[in-house]
Swiss-Prot record:
Its EC number is 3.4.23.4. One of its GO terms (molecular function) is aspartic-type endopeptidase activity. The lineage of its organism: Eukaryota, Metazoa, Chordata, Craniata, Vertebrata. It is an enzyme of class 3 (hydrolase). This is Chymosin. Keywords: Aspartyl protease, Digestion, Disulfide bond, Hydrolase, Protease, Signal, Zymogen. It comes from Ovis aries (Sheep).
Length: 381
């Protein structure tokens, strides 16, 4: 079955039928933008890192820590409405809702970004339902509607979209993306909302019910491919991992080792593959073991710094997933900027779940297979 998945997806790519490629560009991370404006220290003191919680309560309020997007750098273009209005979005496999700022939003974050004007779209329909997503200490409030969304060569009609009427604080003001397009399972979406990729599958707008992500380390050539697997972005074979909970793209990690010794995830743990999170996030105790093993030291904001001159002598961290080893070298798990190096590992106090973000995805081409509920991983070029 797994070989058939690859053969069909690659065949679809070779035929060029209904294959959608969305170039992803690497922009300035929110962390750097806040730092340039002297706002990073205050932000880090106020925010807490964590995994998105379930949707619950009246109005279907979601909770997504704002720090999830602090280091996100890979964005793409979509178009909403008729005639189309252009937006830059973060394609996020860690959430399921699709939203953009609207003209009804007066928050600073909205004023600094493209805002959708439903009055100028002949295909917009107001659903009349509220949308609320909590981000850190604030929340995005909005309304749900239907409209046509165009993603590369796909025209997706009657797509539910959230139009923000309020965005939290001033943090989103400095983000390079306007909105978020969630690509997780529909069980994670708010009530009345259908994820974009689900709508595409239901309308048979994609050749195969899967999508794949390649994140180039330099930022050039990164690509989201809908409906196909592109072998030109990886070497060797894809290895498949069963999704354990059809909510996030969640699976089992067998262990995390350094020099053959288990340093984290002993006995196995759950992880999600998340394009909307840059770092590798795990339980604080496990992450602390890793930070100590790689020689990282904690700074006053709780982040971990690394001596840039030590990279060549630092150990490789290995994730074992479904019996396959996925090594991360120091150059993969370390962020280098303006002479400073920081660890790509981040601790979380309130969760046993891991998040494998861009640090991992840059090293391993990732396939998200909805038809078979599998994640495919191969060494990226």
């Amino acid at each position: 079955m797994r070989c058939l998945v690859v053969l069909l997806a690659v065949f679809a790519l070779s035929q060029g039928a209904e294959i959608t490629r969305i170039p992803l560009y690497k922009g300035k991370p929110l962390r750097k933008a806040l730092k340039e404006r002297g706002l990073l220290e205050d932000f880090l003191q106020k925010q807490q890192y964590g995994v998105s919680s379930e949707y619950s309560g009246f109005g279907e309020v979601a909770s997504v820590p704002l720090t999830n997007y602090l280091d996100s750098q890979y964005f793409g273009k979509i178009y909403l409405g008729t005639p189309p209005q252009e937006f830059t979005v973060l394609f996020d496999t860690g959430s399921s809702d699709f939203w953009v700022p609207s003209i009804y939003c007066k928050s600073n974050a909205c004023k600094n970004h493209q805002r959708f004007d439903p009055r100028k779209s002949s295909t917009f329909q107001n659903l009349g339902k509220p949308l609320s997503i909590r981000y850190g200490t604030g929340s995005m409030q909005g309304i749900l509607g239907y409209d046509t969304v165009t993603v590369s060569n796909i025209v997706d009609i009657q797509q539910t979209v959230g139009l923000s009427t309020q965005e939290p604080g001033d943090v989103f003001t400095y983000a390079e993306f306007d909105g978020i397009l969630g690509m997780a399972y529909p069980s994670l979406a708010s009530e009345y909302s259908v994820p974009v990729f689900d709508n595409m599958m239901d309308r048979r707008l994609v050749a195969q019910d899967l999508f794949s992500v390649y994140m180039d380390r330099s930022g050039q050539g990164s690509m989201l491919t809908l409906g196909a697997i592109d072998p030109s972005y990886y070497t060797g074979s894809l290895h498949w991992v069963p999704v354990t909970l059809q909510k996030y793209w969640q699976f089992t990690v067998d262990s995390v080792t350094i020099s053959g010794a288990v340093v984290a995830c002993e006995g196995g743990c759950q992880a999600i593959l998340d394009t909307g999170t840059s770092k590798l996030v795990g339980p604080s105790s496990d992450i602390l073991n890793i930070q100590q093993a790689i020689g990282a030291t904690q700074n006053q904001y709780g982040e971990f710094d690394i001596d840039c001159d030590s990279l060549s002598s630092m150990p490789t961290v290995v994730f074992e997933i479904n019996g396959k080893m996925y090594p991360l070298t120091p150059y993969a798990y370390t962020s280098q900027e303006e002479g400073f190096c920081t660890s790509g590992f981040q601790g979380e106090n309130h969760s046993h779940q891991w998040i494998l973000g861009d640090v991992f995805i840059r090293e391993y081409y990732s396939v998200f297979d909805r038809a078979n509920n599998l994640v495919g991983l191969a060494k990226a070029i």
